[in-house]
């Protein structure tokens, strides 16, 4: 569904014309999202051996790649043997559950370990402030490592170009995915209760209550008391007009944020699954795949699994829609780019950079997009392979949610040096509300006070 439109079925436009128009509108309405390049929508891209780069210059080296079990790691892993054939560089991989990975990686980096050489990362401010991340501008400017015409940064979504930039213009990461919080619906479950697609938060609550049964929750979202569970709830805060941090102070105890968390708690306490206070993203996804929840809000990247009949019992009745909004306001879902970084202590930095260049190139992105990965490239997003694997309706919803997102508010928290501490405090408060331990006002006021005290030291 396009912004401002009404659709009883909840479907979004899926024609090629409307899809391409959405790409352009994303760039026009939100400057951080890319316009289509003038040369058109090529379904192929120059192969790696067409680049003016000596891919074999680090043959024999081995780089360690670490990350979360995630659509990106699932898509890139099968292609790694091709990278080794191209470069002679071996890649050892270590992918873990996201919560486990994000908890262990900072400890490893803080100890000064030279591995992993390349890693998926989210707490950029912490990594940059502590010197864990290698600055990359110099690598992009070295002609022995980069062929600018072949890599073609103009093909990147504008968010992907702007997102990794630190305040001094240096970049310490390369974006590898694009995602925004998206509403997933089981159309049959809603139709059985004669419920239309909810558009506002109040409508979402009414619908979630109406469709909840003994065997199916009305809605599932993350509520675990840890920062990794924060993206859906942050979208509620942003959509109510709140923010996470402003001027180096935690502000999620504002009236707007408190109202947002109160609604989040009502949804999950009144219509959520049993035990939702322990839910992480994989619990949410599994409930939706198995038909145990009528609705869910989480990453747009779930679409690949949801639309896959081999993994999903609801593939044929699944719908994808824009993030809900407060009456009188537009939706502001949380968005982010997972990024990959080079360890500043790595002994194989140049080989690691070649890997990042290859992994995010046009040719590789077309391959991963055909597997359903929402990459950072316009050419990949507009490819038929991506729309087939990801689903046209899901792609349209994801683009609309990216368009509606506020990149600055997302970066303000993600790039804060103590983002992990802040996000943990936030979700402890949200969890207290969901579990009924405290009111939203008491929980968020206390959480904000603790976080601000910790920031001040």
Located regions from the model:
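N-terminal secretory signal peptides
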Residues: 1-18, 41
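Hinge/lid segment of periplasmic solute-binding proteins
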Residues: 44-57, 124-180, 205, 315-321, ...
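Short, solvent-exposed loop/beta-turn-alpha elements that line the ligand-binding surface or hinge
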Residues: 53-60, 137-155, 223, 240-261, ...
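C-terminal lobe and pocket-closing loops
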Residues: 130, 141, 301-315, 326-428
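Conserved C-terminal helix/tail region of periplasmic/extracytoplasmic solute-binding proteins
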Residues: 45-50, 57-58, 62, 91, ...
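Glycine-centered hinge/linker elements that transmit conformational signals in sensory
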Residues: 207-212, 247-278, 323
């Amino acid at each position: 569904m396009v912004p401002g439109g009404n659709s009883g079925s909840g479907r979004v436009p899926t024609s090629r014309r409307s899809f391409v128009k959405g790409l352009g509108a994303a760039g026009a309405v939100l400057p951080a999202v890319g316009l289509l390049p003038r040369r058109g929508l090529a379904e192929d891209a120059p192969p790696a051996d067409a680049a003016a780069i000596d891919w074999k210059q680090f043959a024999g080296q081995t780089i360690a790649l670490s990350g979360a079990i995630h659509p990106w790691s699932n898509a890139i892993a099968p292609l790694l043997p091709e990278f080794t054939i191209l470069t002679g560089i071996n890649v050892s991989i270590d992918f873990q559950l996201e919560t486990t990975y994000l908890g262990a990686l900072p400890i490893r980096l803080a100890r000064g370990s030279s591995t992993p050489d390349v890693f998926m990362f989210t707490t950029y401010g912490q990594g940059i402030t502590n010197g864990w991340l290698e600055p990359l501008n110099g690598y992009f400017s070295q002609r022995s490592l980069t062929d600018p015409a072949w890599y073609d940064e103009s093909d990147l979504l504008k968010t992907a170009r702007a997102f990794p930039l630190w305040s001094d213009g240096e970049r310490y990461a390369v974006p590898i995915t694009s995602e925004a919080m998206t509403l997933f619906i089981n159309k049959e479950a809603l139709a059985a209760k004669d419920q239309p697609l909810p558009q506002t938060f109040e409508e979402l609550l009414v619908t979630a209550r109406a469709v909840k049964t003994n065997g199916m929750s009305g809605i599932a979202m993350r509520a675990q008391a840890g920062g990794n569970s924060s993206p859906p709830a942050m979208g509620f805060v942003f959509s109510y007009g709140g923010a996470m941090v402003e001027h180096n102070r935690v502000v999620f105890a504002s009236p707007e944020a408190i109202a947002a968390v109160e609604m989040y708690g009502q949804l999950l306490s009144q219509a959520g699954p049993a035990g939702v206070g322990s839910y992480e993203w994989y619990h949410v996804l599994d409930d939706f795949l198995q038909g145990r929840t009528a609705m869910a809000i989480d990453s747009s990247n779930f679409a690949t699994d949801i639309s896959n009949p081999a993994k999903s019992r609801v593939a044929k009745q699944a719908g994808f829609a824009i993030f809900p909004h407060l009456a009188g306001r537009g939706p502001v879902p949380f968005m982010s780019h997972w990024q990959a970084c080079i360890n500043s202590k790595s002994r194989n930095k140049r080989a690691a950079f070649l890997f990042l260049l290859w992994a995010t190139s046009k040719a590789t992105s077309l391959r991963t997009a055909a597997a359903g990965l929402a990459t950072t490239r316009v050419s990949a997003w507009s490819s038929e392979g991506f729309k087939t694997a990801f689903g046209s309706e899901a792609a349209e919803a994801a683009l609309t949610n990216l368009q509606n997102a506020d990149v600055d508010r997302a970066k303000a928290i993600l790039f804060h040096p103590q983002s992990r501490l802040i996000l943990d405090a936030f979700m402890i408060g949200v969890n207290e509300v969901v579990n009924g331990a405290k009111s939203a006002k008491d929980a968020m006021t206390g959480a904000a006070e603790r976080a601000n005290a910790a920031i001040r030291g």
